[in-house]
Every structure is written in C-alpha cells, then in structure tokens.
C-alpha cells in the first residue's frame, strides 16, 4: 500500500474538528490580552526577556544588550526559537507568546495526526476503518497538542511529531521532488524555531545513530542524510557566535557561567523518575499509557501479522527509545556521569538530560500505535475479549486526556475568562505593567525623559519586570 491514498471523509472531518479544538485555545488569549496567564518560571522570568531585548536590538549591529547586566553579550540571552524573534518585533509580548502557544500546539496536533495516519497506512484491515483511524489520530493529536509545554520554547517539543513524520516520509523512494522539498523545508523550519541545546542535540544524535544503523543494514537513505545535514547547518548558523565564544575564538566577553557545582544522584532513582514521570518541562502524564502499552503487547504479541507490521515496529522502536533515553539521562546525572563531566571545562554544565524532551512525542506515538493495534484486532475478530480490551484502553485514554486538560495552559485562562477575580498571576501582574506605566508617566511629566533614555533598577520586584 502507498501513501497515495488521500484522506477522505469521514477522516477529513475528524482532522478538521481536531484542528478547530486546538485553534480554539487561542480565544481566551485574545479576550484576556495582558491579563492572560502564562507559566512565569523559565518563561516570563527569562526567555521572554531574551526575545524582547534581541528584537529591540535586531538591526543595531551591536554585540551587546545594554539593558541586560549593564551591557552583556548578546550570546548571554540565546533565544530558544530564534525565528520567533519576529513575533516580538511586530507584536506586543503577550500576543507574541500566545501566538507561539497556539502555533506550537497546532503543529504538534497536525504532526501527531499525520504520524499515526502513516503508521496505519499499510494495514489492509484498517483501510476499511478510515473514519475510526481518523478519530483515534485526532484524539491522540489533541492530547499531545494540549500538553503543558512552555510555548516560549517554540517547536523544541511541539514540533517533534511533524519532524519525525517528515523524516519517515523522506525514506520512501516514491516521494516526488515537490514532496521531498516540502519535508526538507519543514526540517529547516524546525531548526529555526527550536533550540540546539534543548532538544536539537538529541534529535541530531539519535538521528545520526539511526542513519549509521541504516547504513550498516544497507538501507541508507540519501534524502534523510541530506535532511540531517540541513538541520545541522541550521543550528550551526544560529549558534555560530556562541560556539566561537565557547572555544575561545572571537570576543572574550563571558556570557555564561564559567564555574559549576555538579551533584551526583542515584542512577536507579533517577532512571525510575525519568521513565515513570519524565524530566523538567517534559512531564507528560503517561502513567496510563505505560499500562496500555504493556497489556497491548501482551494481547497482540502472538497475533502479529504482516498487515500490522509497521504499527508494531513503530511501537517497539518507540518503547525502546524511551527506555534508552531514560537510561542515558540517568547516567548523565549519576556519579559516573558527573565524574566524566568534571574535566570537560565549559561543556561540563551542558544539560544532556534534556534528551528527555523527546520522550513525550514517543509516548503519545506509542499510545496511538496501541490503539491502532487493538482496533485492528477488534476488526479482525469481534469477540468479548477484544471488545473489553479496546474499551478499557479507550477509558484509560480518556482519563489521560482529562488529566492533560486539567494541567494544560488553557485551563487557568478559561477560569480567568469566566472569573476575572481568579487569583493566578497574569502577564500584567508579573511584569507590574500598571505600576511601571505610572513610573513612566511620572518621569516623563516631571523630567521629560523617555524610557529609552533611562534604566529601571529592580528593588523589591522581579528583575524581569524592570527589563520588560
């Protein structure tokens, strides 16, 4: 079977319904404006400031940000999604951040939907159940889109399913030149809207291992290799100045910490945490998904068929990568990892445990594969056992979806929209917008000074407020 089979109704309907459900999350942001609620840790207190200052000095040709640390190097504030600086150049900060949230979630939804459609594509049995396959892909895609990733990181997490889909399509020999160019364009787009040090290094590393294994098995794909090079070059161009500084070439201004205190943790405790919970900013509520994966494998392991080979292989590889990632991250933070890193100079502070940022994409791809396998089994033989298995799996999936919705970035904004007295700290509250507007007005009325002519010192408020 080939991908020439285009999505038709009713799967088209499911796709559009899911897309609308994801885009609808932007409505509360439009209503609330500066009263919208965003996670402020590692977002409003840091990365948003990086975007604002870099956008402010986008064309001045200076290597210094005068507002930051009394004139620090531009490399001290590296943007996690460099192309998004244009949003902060053209739009108010709260609108730009809301756009990053909606756009990131939408790309995540579309990517996961297409990824699961690709997995189910070679199954003859599922080809007669396109509507149900579309519904399952829509469900898992929406779940991934609503995960509470920080939008300030661009496509570093939300963009992974689409990247994986494009890479898998590039491997197929019957792709047209136009299709290959589109897939390559997304690879570059992903690089421009993600960070090398957050998830990019892990993507490049695992992808390189994939290509090496494919070469050893004589299944090397030149199209995939070219795409890998494109992503690498994109990251090198984005981070060239920082790399030169790290290796002592060019400017001597220190923009990052030079001293680090590394503390080792228990390998097994960290491995268990990585596998069952995830890492910082990569918590994805996959507890029930792990259970679903276990009993799905038990249910279908003896009934594997050529008809579902791609789905089962995708599930197996996803689970294998999840375990590998959890192990690698635990080793990095363990006594062995800390001992090895101690002699690495500036690189010893590199957070390679961020490889865990790839895990949510793999967990939800695995969930989709489990649902497809159980659906295929149910279509093949409608017995009580298969009906119960599929029903229980759907109940656990809905339970996970409910948990995601309760923890999503949408929930507090819905509550704020309904009840303006809702107590969570808003964008306006965090940056003390009203207070600083009064300060600005007072200084202008009494001294004739405009904001570009003076600096605000933070006394009793978060430094980010003054920089904003």
Predicted regions and their residues:
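Start-transfer (signal-anchor) and selected internal transmembrane alpha helices
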Residues: 1-29, 131
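Membrane-interface coil-to-helix junctions
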Residues: 22-112, 153-154
